[in-house]
Amino acid sequence: MAVKNKVVIVTGASSGIGRATAKLLGESGAKVVLAARNEDKLQQAVAEIKEKGGEAAYKVTDVSKREEVKALVDFAISEYGKIDVIFNNAGLMPNAPLSELKNSEWDEMIDVNLKGVLNGIEAVLPHFIKQKSGHVISTSSVAGLNTYLGAGVYCATKHGVKALMEVLRKESANEKMNVRTTTLYLGAFRTELATRITNKAIKERIEFLYDTIGADPMIVAEAVKFAIDLPEEVSMNEITLYSTAQL
């Protein structure tokens, strides 16, 4: 299932890993539909892809809203006639100790990190089942494999993504959907995740981590491309990437 001519939706595409992945896939011949909430950054990202000769379009989308994600998939199909891959990458990480009771931040993480992935699956699955082909890629985190102080809700959402994707893989095989799945468990990469952290001590620690040992988001983009490029009868079910310097 080579990347060239595949129609790929990338959420969280205005910056970081999503933007790097959209750029690489676009330059590799995919038809990329970028989605995020920041229209200015989406326009810039699409322009960069087109300058390199790639095909790309964008749609402002809040992945926490089911109807907007369904509209995103409909838009991709109207633009390019089909949908082959969705990369559920949008995420937030406003970490703080549970004792701070930042319930609005809890709700937002659950809505974007977990329900956003579920909304993406819901929107594409009928199309994938009908065409007997498709690929769901979702960003979890090493916080989906471990637990960390000050990251209780974030860890819970990323463990949830892990569970969703594992069940989707098994149900795809059991129901003969022929839908491939890939879950990314990512360590420290240079992204904007720390910008939403309101706890000063945690924000400073994460920013220092990213600044000192954070890896290039393009490395994740290369891994995503590799997973898509594999033959259709094979799923790269899990990819774990740490910065080499990360404990």
What residue ranges belong to the model's regions?
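Residue(s) in the substrate-gating loop at a strand-loop-helix junction
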Residues: 141
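The beta1-alpha1 cofactor-binding region of Rossmann-like NAD(H)/NADP(H)-dependent oxidoreductases
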Residues: 39-40, 60-72, 103
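Substrate-binding pocket helix/loop in short-chain dehydrogenase/reductase
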Residues: 97-98, 105-110
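Conserved glycine-rich Rossmann-like NAD(P)H-binding loop of the short-chain dehydrogenase/reductase
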Residues: 30-44
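Conserved glycine-rich cofactor-binding loop
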Residues: 14-15
